[in-house]
């Protein structure tokens, strides 16, 4: 596995900047179980970064719709979705190594074969590895909201990123986002509405009710009990 990732930030115009961050500084401590999963299952389910477009049929050994999840955390929801939808292929990207290890361990526990994972910067993967018009869905759940105003430019949801996602979706494919920070939800809605070629799937052109396809996380359920909100946005590529 690689030892460094390129972590995206954005300038005041929403254009991507690049800086190198090492896993050592970002990853935290691996548990024995996570390390064991990386040692045993990465050769089977892990995907190394490359600068050429990936052949999804070869990667998964079949022709099926591909769902890409950016930033899957510890992977619990991603593994659940893959288990519930064996007719789809899932590719998850996460830059934190403990999360990758935890996801691999969970995937093996439920014995799924339709999931692959990467440990690299999602922006670079999108630009270099994902073929145009190849994805049925892109999922971005609970990205860092960068609460402080002076840090808002670092949010991943900016017009250039949204346009990049659009180019990778098939016509009819969906970009699904979720956040528990209402100002970020409003920011997402504003950015998505500003980019031509998408259709908001909300009845009121704002937010959608959490679809059954997105599992309710323990953190989210606890937040709901405390009265915290979560906002889902789903936009379809129409051209």
From Swiss-Prot:
Q: Alphabetically list the UniProt keywords.
A: Methyltransferase, S-adenosyl-L-methionine, Transferase, tRNA processing
Q: Name one GO cellular component term.
A: tRNA methyltransferase complex
What is the active site of this protein?
144
Q: Name one GO molecular function term.
A: tRNA (guanine(46)-N7)-methyltransferase activity
Indicate which residues the UniProt annotation says bind substrate.
148, 180, 217-220
- The EC category is transferase
Catalytic activity entry: guanosine(46) in tRNA + S-adenosyl-L-methionine = N(7)-methylguanosine(46) in tRNA + S-adenosyl-L-homocysteine
Amino acids binding S-adenosyl-L-methionine: 69, 94, 121, 144
UniProt pathway? tRNA modification; N(7)-methylguanine-tRNA biosynthesis
What segment(s) does the record annotate as region Interaction with RNA? 150-155
Keyword Phosphoprotein recorded: no
Listed InterPro entries? SAM-dependent_MTases_sf, tRNA_(Gua-N-7)_MeTrfase_Trmb, tRNA_methyltr_TrmB_bact
Asked if the record carries the keyword Magnesium, the reply is: no
Superkingdom to which the source organism belongs = Bacteria
Q: What is its EC number?
A: 2.1.1.33
- Give a Pfam family name: Methyltransf_4
Q: Give the protein's biological function.
A: Catalyzes the formation of N(7)-methylguanine at position 46 (m7G46) in tRNA.
- Family assignment from sequence similarity: Belongs to the class I-like SAM-binding methyltransferase superfamily. TrmB family.
Q: What NCBIfam families does its record include?
A: tRNA (guanosine(46)-N7)-methyltransferase TrmB
Q: Subunit structure of this entry?
A: Monomer.
- This chain belongs to the protein called tRNA (guanine-N(7)-)-methyltransferase
Question: What is the scientific name of the source organism?
Answer: Pectobacterium atrosepticum (strain SCRI 1043 / ATCC BAA-672)
Output the lineage of the source organism: Bacteria, Pseudomonadati, Pseudomonadota, Gammaproteobacteria, Enterobacterales
Q: Which gene underlies this protein? A: trmB
